[in-house]
Design a protein with these regions (language model features):
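Short acidic DE-rich linear segments
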Residues: 74-80
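Recognition helix of helix-turn-helix/homeodomain-like DNA-binding domains
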Residues: 36-51
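The alpha-helix within a helix-turn-helix
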Residues: 30-31
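A broad helix-preferring feature
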Residues: 24, 34-36
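A short, Lys/Arg-rich alpha-helix, primarily the initiator
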Residues: 1-23, 27
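Basic side chains
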Residues: 27, 43-44, 56
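DNA major-groove recognition helix of helix-turn-helix/homeodomain DNA-binding modules
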Residues: 54-73
Length: 80
């Protein structure tokens, strides 16, 4: 998960840009961590396929990391 610099001093524009990228960042990170193709990601997302404990832990870690990134991004504006 890459960390981007603040693109502007515009809170709304910056957080919007970050959130628009969230689904792609989540998918790409889960695929990388789990060793899946994009097709496997969507097949598992739409089906009732079971996840291994390792996959479950990686999916949760990716989600937590992305949420932390957005929280950290918004906190940069709180100190201004």
């Amino acid at each position: 998960m890459e960390t981007n610099q603040l693109s502007s001093n515009n809170l709304l524009l910056d957080l919007h840009a970050e959130m628009v990228q969230l689904p792609k960042s989540f998918r790409d990170s889960v695929c990388k961590e789990c060793g899946w193709s994009e097709a496997t990601f969507y097949r598992k997302a739409k089906g009732t396929y079971p996840f291994s404990n390792a996959e479950r832990d990686k999916i949760l870690a990716v989600g937590d990391g992305l949420l932390k990134r957005i929280r950290d991004r918004s906190n940069k504006y709180r100190g201004r």
